[in-house]
A protein has these predicted regions:
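Structural signature of tandem alpha-helical TPR/SEL1-like repeats
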Residues: 46-56, 80-93, 114-124
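Juxtacatalytic substrate-recognition/specificity segment
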Residues: 154-265, 276-285, 291-298, 302-311, ...
């Protein structure tokens, strides 16, 4: 399953900073020009046009190098473009210019977290929490990173050209190698299916069942999660099993989808993950879907766009079934090429409705009606 997370969690506070730019005093002509570029960059960030946003913030700084908001925006855009050293310089400069703002430290924490430097990430988030003590999300994030660091600080590592796996104890070396082999297979197969191969190393962390629950707070029905890293509870893995292969393909698909777009409705994300793991809808499930469709009780797909994390066992079972059913209908009716186009449209900032209309060339409503009719 995918755990909902946002690498652009700082955007709201950044928008407030931009809105207040220059509001407290009269601006020079150059500062006014800088604010115009600043607001353009803000709009480009909102629609995930990171390179264009970076260019706009750099233009703003040519007119006003003392703008904390422009340095912050440039740091955020560069963070998303994975230009980490440049992002860090801009974020540190933003913190110097506006020492009461927690946002630069928040993004720096995300940057070091992505680099797997958990100790440095925690240090930056501690600074952010000190500046924004009422930010519950920040405090929660800091507590989780502390749990991760305590749990993983002595883990072993193994790598391939595409993956880094972390695990505790030499007895899990073979388990790590089995998992890496399966993930390399997934890299090829899912890549061929979606015509997309991520070019950045993906981390995979293997936990005991207790460690998994402590670090992730995942629901009991979850066999693994993807939250920027693949996290899996494992027992004594000694050989590949069909269940392990399905689980790894499922979570790896989430990583691929996330790499294409940070904005994917959960029904589409979970449906694709089940599709690529090879999950089939069995005869009992087909009967259940038909019965629900005949009764007119299939949910609106818009109701399945948010996280499934808070669902109970039965609710989650049906949410996943509806997700797989709708995605299989989409692939069978329009082809995987159109599904990939839909994901790319979402990656450009389109909402689900616009993404579907641009991707598969019919409206969200028409797609949903077609899916529901196919089950009757």
């Amino acid at each position: 399953m995918q755990k909902m997370f946002r690498a652009d969690i700082v955007l709201v506070s950044f928008l407030l900073l931009v809105a207040g730019a220059g509001a407290s005093h009269a601006l020079t002509a150059e500062q006014n020009t800088a604010v115009r570029f600043l607001k353009t960059g803000m709009e480009q960030l909102k629609v995930v046009e990171y390179q264009a946003a970076r260019d706009s913030f750099e233009q703003a700084l040519r007119y006003d190098d003392s703008s904390a908001a422009a340095h912050l925006g440039l740091g955020i855009a560069s963070f998303h473009l994975h230009d980490d050293s440049y992002a860090e310089r801009q974020l540190m400069r933003a913190a110097e210019l506006n020492p009461r703002d927690a946002t630069p430290y928040q993004v720096l924490g995300e940057l070091y977290y992505r680099k797997d430097d958990l100790e440095s990430a925690a240090s930056f988030w501690e600074k952010a929490v000190a500046l924004a003590p009422d930010a519950a999300d920040l405090r929660s994030r800091l507590e989780r990173i502390r749990k991760e660091h305590r749990t993983e600080k002595d883990f072993n590592r193994d790598v391939t050209s595409h993956f880094l796996v972390k695990y505790e104890g030499r007895e899990k070396i073979e388990a790590g190698r089995i998992i890496l082999r399966i993930l390399e297979d997934a890299y090829g197969e899912v890549g061929r299916g979606l015509s997309y191969y991520p070019d950045r190393e993906l981390q995979v962390i293997l936990y005991s069942g207790r460690q998994f629950q402590e670090v992730t707070d995942a629901p009991g029905w979850s066999g693994g999660i993807y939250d920027g890293k693949i996290r899996i509870p494992i027992g004594g893995i000694e050989q590949e099993t069909p269940g392990l292969r399905k689980l790894l393909y499922h979570e790896y698909t989430h990583a691929v989808v996330r790499s294409i777009t940070p904005r994917c409705p959960t029904w589409l994300n979970e449906g694709l993950a089940q599709y690529f793991e090879g999950h089939e809808i069995d005869s009992r499930q087909k009967v259940a879907l038909n019965r629900i469709a005949q009764a007119g009780k299939l949910p609106a797909l818009s109701d399945l766009e948010g996280s499934f994390m808070g669902l109970g066992n039965s609710q989650a079972m049906y949410a996943y079934l509806f997700s797989l059913s709708s995605v299989r209908y989409m692939v069978d009716s329009f082809g995987m090429y159109r599904v990939k186009t839909l994901l790319e449209e979402l990656g450009k900032g389109a909402d689900t409705g616009k993404g579907i209309s641009n991707g598969i060339m019919i409206s969200y409503e028409e797609f949903e009606r077609g899916w529901k009719r196919s089950l009757e």
